[in-house]
Amino acid sequence: MMCGLEIHVQLETESKLFCDCPTNYKEAPANSNICPVCLNQPGAKPYPTNEKAIENALMISLMLNCKIDKGFTYFMRKHYDYPDLPSGYQRTSVPIGYEGELNGVRIREIHMEEDPGQYKPDRGTVDFNRSGIPLIEIVTEPDIKSPEEARTFLKELIRVLQYSGGARGEGTMRADVNISIEGGNRVEMKNINSIKGAYKALKFELVRQKNLMKRGVEIKQETRAYLESQMITVGMRLKEDADDYRFIPDPDLPPMEISDAQIENVLEIMPEAPHNKVRRFTEEYGIDAESAKVLTSELDLAIAYEAVAKQVDPKFASMWMRDELKRVLSYNKLDFADSGILVEDIVELLEMLQNKEITTKAGQRIIEHMPNNKQTPKAIAEELGLLGVVKDDEVIAAVKQAIEENPKAVNDYLEGQKSSLNFLVGQVMRLTRGKADPGETVKILKENIE
């Protein structure tokens, strides 16, 4: 299987690409954020290209390791007929970035476009609020070899876009997915709007094309639609070539110059890309790559980790934030930014653990109460009665009592049933009201049984 992606992502700007209409099209009443320019009415001339859109397009190109086409860049008219395109053409730039790479997938080019309106065939209505919203199209080489690789690439791309702050995120992303298998023609699946959708569409299309090949049926070069509700693809039309779009330079828009100074300005404000941050975390803090990937899955979480790692052992902080904090965030369906958990609260909790003021189990219970809780970890511990760790002699006494009261579990453990040891640990924790250290308890149990 060979797969290439064409990913359309809306850029984060306050106004449209060639006019001053606002870009909050989702909240606005239908056909209210419009003007003669974004409707392409006769005589209406486009404004100069939105500077913020150019800056964001450059930033994303650089974060995806692209070379920048310095000098003059111009817009073309891409002609096609559809109800959401009143002019009959879409303005699309020549590539701004080219020859990039992400996650082992080569990026052929990145160029700017204007978004068309929103056509709803089932109702026969068109909302032009979206018309003219700035887009970039990210075009990859056909380097993706499986649906799983496509899913991984798109997840990593979304992470880069979130870090950049210059894109509107997965909810506005649309992907055209091109797939071919050996002996067949290329098939394009249009306007898939989620990572899950791209993965499911590729899985279905791969099976469909293999079945056609087995039956000796030709795989047509065509455009297909992915029906998310049924998780299938259906034919739309024969695939267009570039000549079908009749590209011509747009005479209403002067070329825009991309200078060295402009690129330097973008580099100064550009955040560190997540894949670069992963590499730096492993080198600077000595944590493993998998932990670094988890900690950089959100920009705010990565920033928090760095702040914590300056005050607490970085590896200890990594372990707790990777496992326990992410577990709690996932359970509550929260991003770190929305959790209300402060850096100083994480530091306080980890210091309590390091100073043996609380047990590991107590720490796990405390962190479960931390999201959107104005209490400090110490206050939570006091409220739940979790402060304090019992002394070794108290643990030894509890261990001996657990052994005496549970001879069957002891015999089962000696006969090879390792799970019985967990039962005995639980009994010791009960006797010490959860204030014994689980690791130390296991050690003392083994010494007394074996």
UniProtKB/Swiss-Prot annotation:
SMART domains to which the protein is assigned, alphabetical: GatB_Yqey (SM00845)
Record InterPro entries: Asn/Gln-tRNA_amidoTrfase_suB/E (IPR017959), Asn/Gln-tRNA_Trfase_suB/E_cat (IPR006075), Asn/Gln_amidotransferase (IPR018027), Asn/Gln_tRNA_amidoTrase-B-like (IPR003789), GatB (IPR004413), GatB_C_1 (IPR042114), GatB_Yqey_C_2 (IPR023168), Gln-tRNA_amidoTrfase_suB_CS (IPR017958)
EC code(s) of this entry: 6.3.5.-
Catalytic activity from the UniProt record: L-glutamyl-tRNA(Gln) + L-glutamine + ATP + H2O = L-glutaminyl-tRNA(Gln) + L-glutamate + ADP + phosphate + H(+); L-aspartyl-tRNA(Asn) + L-glutamine + ATP + H2O = L-asparaginyl-tRNA(Asn) + L-glutamate + ADP + phosphate + 2 H(+)
Keyword Disulfide bond included in the entry's annotation: no
Superkingdom of this protein's organism: Archaea
GO BP: glutaminyl-tRNAGln biosynthesis via transamidation; translation
Pfam family, one: GatB_Yqey
UniProt KW keywords: ATP-binding, Ligase, Nucleotide-binding, Protein biosynthesis
Matching SUPFAM superfamilies: GatB/YqeY motif, Glutamine synthetase/guanido kinase
GO molecular function, one term: asparaginyl-tRNA synthase (glutamine-hydrolyzing) activity
Coiled coil spans: none
NCBIfam families with a match to the protein in the record: gatB, PRK05477.1-2
Family named by the database record: Belongs to the GatB/GatE family. GatB subfamily.
Summary of the function given for this chain in its UniProt record: Allows the formation of correctly charged Asn-tRNA(Asn) or Gln-tRNA(Gln) through the transamidation of misacylated Asp-tRNA(Asn) or Glu-tRNA(Gln) in organisms which lack either or both of asparaginyl-tRNA or glutaminyl-tRNA synthetases. The reaction takes place in the presence of glutamine and ATP through an activated phospho-Asp-tRNA(Asn) or phospho-Glu-tRNA(Gln).
Matches recorded under HAMAP family: GatB
Complexes and interactors: Heterotrimer of A, B and C subunits.
Protein name: Aspartyl/glutamyl-tRNA(Asn/Gln) amidotransferase subunit B
Organism: Methanobrevibacter smithii (strain ATCC 35061 / DSM 861 / OCM 144 / PS)
Phylogenetic classification of the source organism: Archaea, Methanobacteriati, Methanobacteriota, Methanomada group, Methanobacteria
